[in-house]
Amino acid sequence: MKIIYFSFTGNVRRFIKRTELENTLEITAENCMEPVHEPFIIVTGTIGFGEVPEPVQSFLEVNHQYIRGVAASGNRNWGLNFAKAGRTISEEYNVPLLMKFELHGKNKDVIEFKNKVGNFNENHGREKVQSY
């Protein structure tokens, strides 16, 4: 499964690099409108008061048919808006919210994400994956 991510401050990029997963693509202003022709999990940060970043919105407008799950980063100081972009994407595109993590994540978050991606790959197409 492809992992597509957007990193406004570098936290999500650091998180993804720590997973050592190979099939990844970073969304940028230059490529956010390019089509992707395979299923993916999207990982994004949250901006402002819980908003989905504009490049992610643009990317999903073009590629929403291939999204299979979402994970989100945030800062717990934002309370109920912590990693809210993940919940927003999950609800809008009816896909599971696999996890939320703070900033660039802890080691346990990296392990959890890799396990969930692995389980998702195993179960994809056979049963619904449990949402976070």
UniProtKB/Swiss-Prot annotation:
Gene3D superfamilies: 3.40.50.360. Probably involved in ribonucleotide reductase function. It comes from Staphylococcus aureus (strain NCTC 8325 / PS 47). This is Protein NrdI. GO terms for biological process: protein modification process. GO terms for molecular function: FMN binding. Pfam families: Flavodoxin_NdrI. The gene is nrdI. HAMAP family: NrdI. Signal peptide: none annotated. Belongs to the NrdI family.
